[in-house]
Structures are given as structure tokens and as C-alpha cells.
């Protein structure tokens, strides 16, 4: 199969070497565990964290005479994912045996798909940025294919000083291997691609995307070349299990290859591992070619066939996907592309935001969700589903600001109280005397007191006749009133009394 270069060399993506510029070329093979209660060819459970070898059927253990039976839900999930990737759905596909020996592969082969996968070419649009101007760059990344295959078991080498153990709980679990074209040109693009792919499968409900549990793993193919030149020899970095590590692995590997080539050496085609502690890759084995696995159609499984009506029925029930949702939020709620990009990263966050924004100013809601709520959740190590503040409570805080009942500063304090103690924001404001002071007489007295106490500042303000110093006086008045004074009223009174004009 010939590889087509679809990207024009971009100098901002180049890596500077001792002998000139280099371009990194990246392709990714992402293994995503299919969300299904049972395995690809058996009825054994896929539950994470079970006791070793407790989720193993006779099929998974490769007992003689046990035949695989396709799990239709795994087929549906693969088709849903293919539709979400704007990909060609193949109405006929074939399962093949990929032959190799390893202790955690009891059959002596893996059931996969080689020449006829269930999903063909597709594409993903990623956003890279923001740059120093706050702008994002959209880049289209091609999808080569998606195929279904079995996962292997797990070898454990730390349970006994002289023996290794095998846990077959993962053996036979359904995986979708999603193969990109070699269209990625930087570690930033690779991170954005993996983030976007994880977002899509989570929206679809076809994979939970939990990389720390092994539900999503990436094999990263990296090569370097002179800008616009022929593709270089690639090295595959296996089983990278975090988006951050993907970026680190690419940056190290690209530099390693450039150093070898600039010293007159050649790159060996090999499989490597990434060591996150040392931040470097190391050689694992020479890279296998397809013929090394002796693929042939599995004689125990008929070709997988379905009609277009099957595909159409699944497509009709797909949820709104992140790109469509982002565009809708920008157009209907008037928020920035940057804010929308953050909000749609997780479906649960987008749902929370839309509940808060319903009937309210979209920009104000976005500001509170992104800066205050997500900031607090991140600090506490919580997910949006674990938020102590409900959309209704956060919406009530925003309403109190809009009504003029509380100031922005008091709203921050109220947010902390609701976060820690719960309760109805409106009642809390009443019970704790947090209402904003709107009585002009009371505010004017506070302004007069601050002016009287700072004659030197008054002279400076009047001499300059500029509004810049007014902010200092406003701050002092807000401090004196415990943040309860209406900031707009304070600002107007300060400027009036100091004779400052806009």
C-alpha cells in the first residue's frame, strides 16, 4: 500500500537540527476498548478491576472445541464510531487470525481484521492552539481504517521472584483499532488528535476513554525527514497510556532520530517503549511486518455482513457530536470559539453548561463554568459529575448578580459557601446579610469617608483629571463596605465627586 503525503510543509512545525530543519511525521494506532458488557466472541464479563482470571470463559482460555460467536453489540459500537469519524462503513468485513506466540495469548493467535476491516477511510478535524493571539488552527487528519479485534491477557512479572503469572480477564475483550494516516506533524497535533478522538468516542458511548484503566492506548509511529522529502524510516512507540506521555514520547523520539541522522547513521525500523520516569524511549524489538504474522481468514467465523438499513438505523440515533455542538453554542449563545472548545471537551461539561445557560446570558454562564466551577473541580480532583454545586445553584448565583442583589465579589464568596455547605443561594444571601448595598445615601457616605481620609490621592486625581486613579478609590470603598456596595454606583459617585470625566 502506498502512502500519500497530504500535508504541505509548514515552517512553524519544523524542528531545528545542527544541519538544518527537519519535519516529524506521525501516525497513530489507537486501541479503544469497546463499551460492552461482554467480550467480542464470548459472554464473559468485561468489568474492570475483577479478581484475576475471574472473567474468563472457555473460549477466552482457548479450550479445545470452543468456537467464537460474534457479539452484535460490539459490531454496533464499531459502526457507530465509524459514522462519528465520517468514515466509510463496509457492509462486508472479514475476521482474520494474526499468528504470534505469547503467554497471555492462549489461542496462539489474535482474531483481528486485516484486508477487509469493518470501517474504511474517514477524517477528524482537530483544533491546534491557541497561539499567542488566541487563535486556533483547524487541521484535518485522515483516518485510514477502524477494525475490530480481541485484546490479549496480561502477564504479571512482579508477583513471584522466579515465576510470571497470567491474568486472562482482558483476553477476548473487544477493541477498536483506529488507525490514522501519517498526517500529524507535531506533538501538539498528536495530543489534539488523541484528545479529539477520545472526546468523540465518549460522546458516542462506544468507549469510556479511561486511559489510566487501559481502555484507550496509543501506538505512535514516528519518523523524521527533510521538509517535503521522502518519508523516513519509522519507529513505533507501543502502548502509550496518557495524552501527556504521547507528546513527550514524540518529542524525545524525533530528537533521537534527528541526532542519529545528523551523525551519519541510519534509523532502524523497530518497536520502542516510552519510559515516563526518564522521559525517553528505549528499544523493545525489531518491527514486524504484516507477513510475519501470517494472516489468514479465521475458518471459525463467517464474513460479517449487514445492510445499509442497519447502518442508517444506528446513524439516526447518534447523539450530537462535539463539532456540531461547539458550532451551535457559538451561534446560539454568543460565546467564543475558545470557550465553546473547552465546554464541549466532555459531554457532561457541555450538558452542565447548557443547563446553567438556559434562559440566561451565555457568556456569563460560560465564564462561571469555565473559570470558577472547572477551576474548583480541578483543584479538588473531582469530575463534573461529582460537582457539589448543581446547575440550578450556579444559575441562581448568576441570577442574583444580574438582579443587582449581590456584587461580583460577593458572588465569589457565595460560590464558596454553596460549594462547601450547599443550600439555596437566594436564601443564603438573605440569612447571611450578603445583599449588595444599593442605598445611594449609604454609598455616598462611604465614598465621602474614603475621600476625606485620602486628601493626597484626591489632589493627584484632580490634578491629572484622569479616570485611572478612580479605580483606587472604588477599591477602597468596596473594601470599606465589605464588597457589598454596588460597584457601578460607587464608580459613578467617585468620578462625580473628584470631577473625573471619561
Curated annotation (Swiss-Prot):
Task: Enumerate the InterPro entries for this protein.
Answer: Asn/Gln-tRNA_amidoTrfase_suB/E, Asn/Gln-tRNA_Trfase_suB/E_cat, Asn/Gln_amidotransferase, Asn/Gln_tRNA_amidoTrase-B-like, GatB, GatB_C_1, GatB_Yqey_C_2, Gln-tRNA_amidoTrfase_suB_CS
- One Gene Ontology term of the molecular function aspect: asparaginyl-tRNA synthase (glutamine-hydrolyzing) activity
Q: Does the keyword Cell inner membrane apply?
A: no
Tell me what reaction this enzyme catalyses.
Answer: L-glutamyl-tRNA(Gln) + L-glutamine + ATP + H2O = L-glutaminyl-tRNA(Gln) + L-glutamate + ADP + phosphate + H(+); L-aspartyl-tRNA(Asn) + L-glutamine + ATP + H2O = L-asparaginyl-tRNA(Asn) + L-glutamate + ADP + phosphate + 2 H(+)
- Stated EC number for the protein is 6.3.5.-
Paired cysteines (S-S):
none
Top-level taxon:
Bacteria
Please list the GO biological process terms of this entry: glutaminyl-tRNAGln biosynthesis via transamidation; translation
Q: Which UniProt keywords apply?
A: ATP-binding, Ligase, Nucleotide-binding, Protein biosynthesis
Q: Which Gene3D superfamilies match?
A: 1.10.10.410, GatB domain, N-terminal subdomain
Chain's role: Allows the formation of correctly charged Asn-tRNA(Asn) or Gln-tRNA(Gln) through the transamidation of misacylated Asp-tRNA(Asn) or Glu-tRNA(Gln) in organisms which lack either or both of asparaginyl-tRNA or glutaminyl-tRNA synthetases. The reaction takes place in the presence of glutamine and ATP through an activated phospho-Asp-tRNA(Asn) or phospho-Glu-tRNA(Gln).
Stated family = Belongs to the GatB/GatE family. GatB subfamily.
Q: Per its UniProt record, what HAMAP family does this chain match?
A: GatB
Which NCBIfam families does the protein's record reference? Answer: gatB, PRK05477.1-2, PRK05477.1-4, PRK05477.1-5
Q: How does it assemble?
A: Heterotrimer of A, B and C subunits.
Protein name per Swiss-Prot or TrEMBL: Aspartyl/glutamyl-tRNA(Asn/Gln) amidotransferase subunit B
Taxonomic source organism: Brucella suis (strain ATCC 23445 / NCTC 10510)
Protein encoded by which gene: gatB
Amino acid at each position: 500500500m502506498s502512502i500519500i503525503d497530504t500535508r504541505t510543509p509548514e515552517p512553524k512545525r519544523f524542528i531545528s537540527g545542527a544541519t538544518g530543519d527537519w519535519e516529524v511525521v506521525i501516525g497513530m494506532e489507537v486501541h479503544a476498548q469497546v463499551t460492552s458488557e461482554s467480550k467480542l466472541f464470548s459472554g464473559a464479563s468485561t468489568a474492570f478491576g475483577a479478581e484475576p482470571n475471574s472473567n474468563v470463559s472457555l473460549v477466552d482460555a482457548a479450550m479445545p472445541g470452543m468456537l467464537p460467536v460474534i457479539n452484535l453489540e460490539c459490531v454496533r459500537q464499531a459502526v457507530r464510531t465509524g459514522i462519528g469519524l465520517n468514515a466509510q462503513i463496509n457492509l462486508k468485513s472479514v475476521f482474520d487470525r494474526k499468528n504470534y506466540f505469547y503467554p497471555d495469548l492462549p489461542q496462539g493467535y489474535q482474531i483481528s481484521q486485516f484486508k477487509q476491516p469493518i470501517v474504511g477511510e474517514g477524517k477528524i478535524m482537530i483544533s491546534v492552539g491557541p497561539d499567542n493571539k488566541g487563535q486556533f488552527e483547524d487541521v484535518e487528519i485522515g483516518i485510514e481504517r477502524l477494525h475490530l479485534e480481541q485484546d490479549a491477557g496480561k502477564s504479571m512479572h512482579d508477583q513471584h521472584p522466579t515465576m510470571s503469572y497470567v491474568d486472562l480477564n482482558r483476553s477476548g475483550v473487544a477493541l477498536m483499532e483506529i488507525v490514522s494516516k501519517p498526517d500529524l506533524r507535531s506533538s501538539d497535533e498528536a495530543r489534539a488528535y488523541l484528545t479529539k478522538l477520545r472526546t468523540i468516542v465518549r460522546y458516542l458511548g462506544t468507549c469510556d476513554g479511561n486511559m489510566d484503566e487501559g481502555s484507550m492506548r496509543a501506538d505512535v509511529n514516528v519518523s523524521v525527514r527533510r521538509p517535503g522529502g521522502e518519508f523516513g524510516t519509522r519507529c513505533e512507540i507501543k502502548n502509550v497510556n496518557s495524552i501527556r506521555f504521547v507528546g513527550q514520547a514524540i518529542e524525545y523520539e524525533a530528537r533521537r532520530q534527528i541526532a542519529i541522522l545528523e551523525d551519519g547513521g541510519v534509523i532502524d525500523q523497530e518497536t520502542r517503549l516510552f519510559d515516563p520516569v526518564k522521559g525517553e524511549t528505549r528499544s523493545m524489538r525489531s518491527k514486524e511486518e504484516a507477513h510475519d504474522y501470517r494472516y489468514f481468514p479465521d475458518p471459525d467465523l463467517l464474513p460479517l455482513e449487514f445492510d445499509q438499513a442497519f447502518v442508517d438505523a444506528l446513524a439516526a440515533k447518534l447523539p450530537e457530536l462535539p463539532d456540531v455542538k461547539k458550532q451551535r453554542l457559538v451561534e446560539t449563545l454568543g460565546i467564543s470559539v475558545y470557550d465553546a472548545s473547552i465546554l464541549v471537551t466532555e459531554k457532561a461539561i457541555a450538558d452542565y453548561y447548557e443547563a446553567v445557560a438556559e434562559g440566561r446570558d451565555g457568556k456569563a454562564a460560560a465564564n462561571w463554568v469555565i473559570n470558577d466551577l472547572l477551576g474548583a473541580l480541578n483543584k479538588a480532583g473531582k469530575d463534573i459529575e461529582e460537582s457539589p454545586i448543581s446547575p440550578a445553584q450556579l444559575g441562581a448565583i448568576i441570577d442574583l448578580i444580574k438582579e443587582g442583589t449581590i456584587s461580583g465579589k460577593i458572588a465569589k464568596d457565595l460560590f464558596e459557601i454553596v460549594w462547601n455547605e450547599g443550600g439555596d443561594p437566594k436564601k443564603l444571601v438573605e440569612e447571611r446579610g450578603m445583599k449588595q448595598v444599593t442605598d445611594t445615601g449609604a454609598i455616598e457616605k462611604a465614598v465621602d469617608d474614603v475621600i476625606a481620609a485620602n486628601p493626597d490621592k484626591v489632589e493627584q486625581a484632580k490634578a491629572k483629571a484622569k479616570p485611572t486613579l478612580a479605580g483606587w478609590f472604588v477599591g477602597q470603598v468596596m473594601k470599606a463596605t465589605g464588597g457589598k456596595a454596588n460597584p457601578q454606583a460607587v464608580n459613578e459617585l467617585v468620578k462625580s465627586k473628584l470631577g473625573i470625566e471619561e
